[in-house]
């Protein structure tokens, strides 16, 4: 029992010692990741119902993400637009770095059009507001540390054109 307590304490201390990377204590960091589709995101922001920026991000309620993008690939629509989400936590026994959070496939190969992406996604320069509802994954979210830095990788894949676009975001997240 004492060994378990010592290990748990070390994990907590190593996570706390790392702090918030890349300014995530005060702001959302995002970038466009690996992409084969002709889609370019120029803004990504977490917003409330009035369209005002919100930070930190709460994963205990639906997350509204306002984006601006230029889609030169083609129209994306159901059932061919798929979404995969990967989560990463910062810190832990491996030191101050990002490590994958196991989701056991629950966040893989989801129908993007029923999971918050307004479909069809038209061709052209446009604003696109997505609502990602993490509450349906409470079994995963409840295991995450509260008020901690997390990295979210959101990948949208189009099965018609066999292309994909990835958005990466690092944020201070609330899980309680």
Enumerate the language-model features and the residues they cover.
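Cleavable N-terminal signal peptides of Sec/SRP-targeted secreted and luminal proteins
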Residues: 1-16
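N-terminal onset of structured domains
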Residues: 13-117, 121-176
């Amino acid at each position: 029992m004492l060994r378990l307590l010592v290990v748990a304490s070390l994990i907590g201390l190593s996570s706390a010692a790392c702090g918030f990377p890349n300014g995530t204590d005060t702001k959302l960091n995002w970038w466009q990741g690996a992409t084969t589709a002709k889609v370019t995101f120029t803004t990504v922001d977490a917003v409330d119902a009035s369209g005002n920026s919100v930070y930190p991000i709460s994963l205990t309620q639906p997350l509204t993400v306002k984006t601006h993008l230029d889609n030169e690939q083609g129209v994306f629509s159901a059932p061919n637009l798929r979404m995969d989400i990967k989560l990463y936590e910062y810190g832990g026994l491996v030191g101050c770095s990002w490590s994958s959070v196991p989701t056991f496939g629950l966040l893989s190969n989801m129908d993007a059009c029923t999971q918050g992406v307004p479909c069809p996604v038209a061709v052209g320069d446009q604003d696109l507001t997505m609502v990602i509802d993490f509450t349906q994954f409470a079994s995963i979210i409840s295991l995450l540390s509260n008020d901690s830095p997390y990295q979210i990788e959101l990948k949208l894949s189009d099965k018609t054109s066999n292309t994909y676009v990835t958005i990466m975001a690092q944020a201070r997240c609330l899980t309680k």
